């Protein structure tokens, strides 16, 4: 087991990883920018190292400074959390060159899954169902029209190096295709420095289903069930559930088994999430995230297994602590992402939290690094906390969530809490009857 882990992140996930390390008896080092010197994870860590000014590129994305912090403190492993350098293959390779363990997959696997075209090819080879579309990058408009005609309209054009909805355009007819292609390539080039795009069939009313997987790097793989992340705004997840209200046990077992086998065959090590669009009983691969997800706590709630403990164990060479038959699903869990944003316009709302009170009681968990008097810096993601609620079934979970949201108090800034209080009273949400477009349509009604 590791002696000392450096946590290369900030906010709630840095505190989440720190807690896991302390439970395992591992010393902790956190790195931070000058804007985060009073953050909770900095206060609680055994050691902290300031690695630069507030801009991420000069601090949390500064590989040289993070490696230097490892060497200064004697850290033998790095946990990247999510975001920042968590899916940076170069970072993983540099750590390996310095004999420091990256708590995650190999640089090669990060590269494969980071290239959306190569990821789709790999998924197809591993037996994962994929969306009909081009085999690789689209070179010109003529090829785009040919592929679109073969798979049928509407189609969606996606950036090969993309994510978060950037470089993504829908064409409903051939007349739309030229503009959509040019716009997607332009956006992709500007956002990612790579204008390669590919085409897929556009699904009209899909759900977003993702499967949590783990590999030991030696040919074993397991799945921890699925999460439903269909409530989204501009391709950003807002509310997540486990398990999905749309799947039955047979579908869950089938897609989970496919994913676990794929991870084993790939020789993958650590945590990963295989994301799908789900429509009319069929799954279609979108991408694989080679890191811990923001929404991992809902999986922990229904399985009772600490996924960060599992990450650390696998990375240290201890292998998986569970077999597939050991993983049981109990009850239902929902996570709400509490952001420092206007609940209607979603504009950021940095500032000082004058009062912060979290809900409690059976089945309630709050992952947050903020506190009363904390000043939210304007430089980073607006997530200030996650409310995770577990119940014996979805009905109990929703009732408990309603109560927890009523108890949650954040004063001094605007947050998305009012949005969630509205959602828990909506009949569609109560029935689990929603798709990836539902939330944007709901919000548009109030504009």
Label each PLM-derived region with a short phrase:
Residues 135:
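Alpha/beta catalytic cores of group-transfer enzymes, especially the acyltransferase/condensing modules
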Residues 1-126, 138-146, 396:
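ATP-binding N-terminal substructure of ATP-dependent carboxylate-amine bond-forming enzymes
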């Amino acid at each position: 087991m590791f002696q000392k882990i450096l946590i290369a992140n900030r906010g709630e996930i840095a505190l989440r990883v720190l807690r896991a390390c302390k439970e395992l008896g591992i010393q902790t080092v956190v790195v931070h920018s000058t804007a985060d010197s009073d953050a909770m994870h900095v206060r609680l860590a055994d050691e902290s190292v300031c690695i630069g000014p507030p801009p991420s590129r000069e601090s949390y994305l500064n590989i040289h400074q993070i490696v230097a912090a490892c060497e200064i403190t004697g850290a033998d492993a790095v946990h990247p959390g999510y975001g920042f350098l968590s899916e940076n293959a170069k970072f993983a390779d540099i750590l390996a060159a310095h004999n420091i363990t990256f708590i995650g997959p190999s640089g090669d696997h990060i590269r494969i899954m980071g290239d959306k075209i190569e990821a789709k090819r790999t998924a197809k080879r591993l037996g994962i169902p994929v969306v009909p579309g081009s085999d690789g990058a689209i070179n010109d408009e003529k090829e785009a029209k040919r592929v679109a005609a073969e798979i049928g309209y509407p189609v969606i054009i996606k950036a090969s190096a993309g994510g978060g909805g950037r470089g993504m355009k829908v064409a409903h007819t051939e007349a739309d295709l030229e503009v959509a292609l040019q716009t997607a390539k332009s956006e992709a080039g500007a956002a990612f420095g790579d204008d390669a795009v590919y085409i897929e069939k556009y699904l009209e009313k899909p759900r977003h289903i993702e499967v949590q997987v783990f590999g030991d790097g030696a040919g074993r793989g397991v799945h921890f069930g699925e999460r439903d992340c269909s409530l989204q705004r501009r391709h950003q997840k807002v509310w997540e559930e486990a398990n999905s209200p749309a799947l039955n046990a047979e579908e869950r077992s089938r897609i989970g088994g496919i994913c676990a086998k794929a991870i084993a065959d790939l020789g993958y090590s650590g945590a990963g999430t295989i994301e799908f669009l789900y429509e009319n009983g069929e799954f279609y691969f979108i991408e694989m995230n080679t890191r811990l997800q923001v929404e991992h706590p809902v999986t922990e709630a229904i399985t009772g297994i600490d996924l960060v403990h599992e990450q650390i164990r696998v990375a240290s060479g201890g292998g998986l602590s569970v077999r597939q038959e050991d993983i049981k699903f109990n009850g239902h869990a929902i996570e709400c992402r509490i952001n420092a944003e206007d609940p209607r316009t979603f504009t950021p709302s940095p500032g000082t939290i004058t009062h912060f009170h979290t809900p409690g009681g059976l089945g309630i968990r709050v992952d947050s690094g903020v506190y009363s008097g904390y000043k939210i810096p304007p430089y980073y993601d607006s997530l200030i906390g996650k409310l995770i609620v577990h119940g014996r079934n979805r009905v109990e979970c929703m009732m408990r969530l309603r109560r927890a949201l009523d108890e949650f108090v954040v004063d001094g800034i605007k947050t998305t809490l009012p949005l969630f209080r509205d959602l828990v009273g909506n009949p569609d949400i109560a029935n689990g009857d929603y798709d990836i477009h539902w939330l944007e349509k709901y919000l548009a009604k109030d504009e």
